[in-house]
Amino acid sequence: SGKLRYDLYPDYKANRDKNYDKSEYDKMINDYCKKVIEYSKNKSSKEINQEKEEENFHRQRDILFKCLEELYCRQLIFDYVEGDDLIAYYCKHKKPNEKIVIVSGDRDLTQLIADDICVYVTQLKKYITPQNHIEHIGYTHENVLIKKMICGDVSDNIKGIKGVGEKTFFELFPDAKTKRITLDEVLEQSQKLIDERRLKKLKPLKSTENIINKVTNGCQGEDIYEINKKIIDLSEPLLTDEAKKGIDDIMYAPLDPEGRDFKNLYSIIQ
């Protein structure tokens, strides 16, 4: 659940599939055994199929969690927070000299890459590091945040500046592909581009004016840069105190081999 982000931005992930109540998934993990669903005669086949899909989801997820536990993979689930923030907090407080590989299809996580942290992007089937981010993603990892602050994120329904997508962003600020830029520099360069066109008796580009005037189709209004930064910036994870304690507890907890073997794993997946 991403309640902490919904509180900042009500339209967060509003474009996602509404058929499932994702918050209910987390609540039902521990009492998964309550499988029985009562079907009333007046339910449509669509409703029945949806309930079957939900039941299958819970069953498969429960099996996956048991397999991971058997393989010594520690798991954390907390209300109101998202996996990205748990990962970011762990990376921020990792053990000295610990090397981390994050496996995800979410390229937002490349914000976290460092000399000892890389992201295996599942769609690309590549390990993304500070050295190859430009080659595989197209621009320096240092600008993942600023690009999304300006352009938004379609997958999470985060609106950006009107008329400024990724292509336009890099056309306006080509240096952003290879070196870190700040919001102040984006605003300064936008104003410079506006002034240059006016000197040539040309109408300023709407995209640069929108950047200066903070024009967006989203509900963020004039606070768009501040709100988008809080939603997207993984250097400051949005976590509850309970979630922080949960991560702290597992970081140095010893592995418990008692009762684990491949026979158990085989019986789980049968």
Model-inferred region functions:
Residues N15-I269:
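Extended two-metal-dependent nuclease catalytic cores across DNA- and RNA-processing enzymes
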